[in-house]
């Protein structure tokens, strides 16, 4: 494919800072090559990389400057499509661009994250503080004001970038601004009074963390939780309706029994049945009535059958169905959003001389801004991979794959099949035999047998251990035998496959890690290093290798590994809810729970602490539930986790209620409902991921789901010379052409006319979804095209009514 070196003019031009149209280039171009009248709206005066068509600095009126502006704007559009940013937040002038670039770099993201974490961690030092971390009021209030000032600076940069109108339209930013104002007022009041007051609004500090760029997964989770709420609330109301009906019925049936405290009042009936829904008080809640009338058990059996086994499972089914629909709609929305972003970028990259596609010159300019760390060789390989028709220009159809292809990592394909192919014949035969051995089924099943025997041996050894010191000062012979076998296996695989191929497998990395830890455990036993004895306990991890034997187990484990990043964001989402409830709990319930605090309640024994003499010794009877308190943020987190597990959670609730009022139960019940929502979403997410993978495997039985995506491209020597000549004419010697020079020198050294490169990347769920919904995707594209055509007609009909100044255009007119 030839590389064009001639100059051209952008079909769409952006404006300079003053808002005027750029001057026509004085290069002898004809009228058809002059800039069009529908140019852009801002200029870029701080471009770090000059255009390929210029040897150095270019004036604002030159074609090179116009291209540089278009390159950066096109790159911004691609980033907005990738990050799912709305196009109405696109920078509209030079000042907005400067603020946009400042707000979209990792230093700014780290500043956002550090500020949010500082505000959250201040709860460790503010009253009620963790004893070891307590700070003076002046110190923590000053730190809070400093962090809030940083947030003000962040919002000012966003205001400069977005403009006042767009800033007000951005809901999350307005919520963050409102919380910032409240936090500012409270911090100043604390600093002036030198005294902390009730600050429930500290629970809203989480918004600063949620708004961070690095917490995009948390924002998606929260959005899905809110989107799943309508059907969830419908089933929840049905659940509460039956609960109230049964509470009224239970009150009339069991309140005459004076020994039954669970149904003495209607309030107690509702609370008892709410707790019964979690099974935390069963069968205790049934026993007083059951002792008087055995038929009373029917009431509780029917209630649990309806509420726990039917409605709760119905709740999960409804949320799962809603979650599936949300995931599909989210994929469709993001897919069309990316497609629109690509169309915006494409319109900025085509030229007046070549409106049919993007030349390599324009593509290279785009990639300098979109992927600045990508080398010149990788840019050209990306262009080649996109160019399906092998023509000098990229069509819009080819350019639609930019996100998938730009993520590939390129490496030269080795001519030899194995790492040892160039060794002397004797060594080659030895290593080839080892390669055949480690790839054979017999070797693999032998290692599975060794792992199984090792597991049984560890189990027998554990059964034979008695209490006390579990670690002998002498190294067991079985440990040496199995570790030797694993070490030999590791050596054979590295020798037969080569270090690179060996470490490219996730299972091999796991085997290597477990073997290394087993060796460290051997050293800990041999050298009597007691603090490191815990490493020995990791030996049973080898048993996980047995899961590779069955395909279903492999699918489960692969799904689990795929879910880990998303599960981390879901865990962080749950921690955010924990933080908010912990702050509220500290403000209302701090210091009210202590030993012997609840002697008048039904759970007094759980909080009782007393000692008495039995014979000649003193016996201490201690109820440990007083440790479940809200005296500081750490204790609150532990207490909330115990409430999440729900075992005996009502004891904590009743202990707090006995010291405050019955309204305190609303806090605990609300927390249970919120955690039930989050946990249901987590379960629905796991089910959706597993079911999706199973359906994909059934639909695409011949495809390799786990192999990742690989693309192969060949570069000829003539192409390399042309690309290098292009770079020399444009910028002279440049560091990003080093790999191109290395490739060319390698071709000359081995007298090759071409070289093959492999592009690899891991397969994402988006890739699986593209294949899973490929029939529907074409319908989505057609529907999207019809909507764009309708918008284009509306824009053209409204154009005469509102005359635009010459050379100006709105963002929405870039691509309709």
Swiss-Prot record:
Locations listed in the record: Lysosome membrane; Endosome membrane; Early endosome membrane; Recycling endosome membrane
Transmembrane segments: 113-133, 135-155, 178-198, 201-220, 235-255, 295-315, 445-465, 480-500, 504-526, 535-549, 574-594, 671-691
InterPro entries, alphabetized: Ion_trans_dom (IPR005821), TPC1_animal (IPR028801), Volt_channel_dom_sf (IPR027359)
A cellular component term, taken from the record's GO annotations: endosome
Gene Ontology MF annotations: identical protein binding; intracellularly phosphatidylinositol-3,5-bisphosphate-gated monatomic cation channel activity; ligand-gated sodium channel activity; NAADP-sensitive calcium-release channel activity; phosphatidylinositol-3,5-bisphosphate binding; protein homodimerization activity; syntaxin binding; voltage-gated channel activity
A biological process term (GO) from this entry: positive regulation of autophagy
Pfam families the record matches: Ion_trans
Activity regulation summary: Na(+) current is inhibited by ATP in a MTORC-dependent manner. ATP sensitivity is independent of PI(3,5)P2. Probably regulated by Mg(2+) ions, cytosolic Mg(2+) selectively inhibits outward current while lysosomal Mg(2+) modestly inhibits both the outward and inward currents. In the absence of Mg(2+), NAADP readily activates TPCN2, with properties similar to PI(3,5)P2. Both current elicited by PI(3,5)P2 as well as NAADP are inhibited by tetrandrine.
Chloroplast keyword on record: no
Residue intervals annotated with topology Cytoplasmic: 1-112, 156-177, 221-234, 316-444, 501-503, 550-573, 692-816
Coiled-coil boundaries: 769-796
Extracellular side, ranges: 134, 199-200, 256-262, 287-294, 466-479, 527-534, 595-629, 654-670
Biased composition (Low complexity): 50-63, 791-816
Summary of the tissues where the protein is detected: Highest expression found in the heart and kidney, and lowest expression found in the spleen.
Region (Disordered): 17-64, 782-816
SUPFAM superfamilies cross-referenced by the UniProt entry: Voltage-gated potassium channels
Membrane topology: Multi-pass membrane protein
Protein origin, superkingdom: Eukaryota
Subunit structure: Dimer. Interacts with MTOR; the interaction is required for TPCN1 ATP sensitivity. Interacts with STX7, STX8 and STX12. Interacts with JPT2. Found in a complex with LSM12, TPCN1 and TPCN2.
Free-text note regarding domains: Each of the two internal repeats contains five hydrophobic transmembrane segments (S1, S2, S3, S5, S6) and one positively charged transmembrane segment (S4). S4 segments represent the voltage-sensor and are characterized by a series of positively charged amino acids at every third position.
Functional description taken from the UniProt entry: Intracellular channel initially characterized as a non-selective Ca(2+)-permeable channel activated by NAADP (nicotinic acid adenine dinucleotide phosphate), it is also a voltage-gated highly-selective Na(+) channel activated directly by PI(3,5)P2 (phosphatidylinositol 3,5-bisphosphate) that senses pH changes and confers electrical excitability to organelles. Localizes to the early and recycling endosomes membranes where it plays a role in the uptake and processing of proteins and regulates organellar membrane excitability, membrane trafficking and pH homeostasis.
Protein name: Two pore channel protein 1
Organism the protein comes from: Homo sapiens (Human)
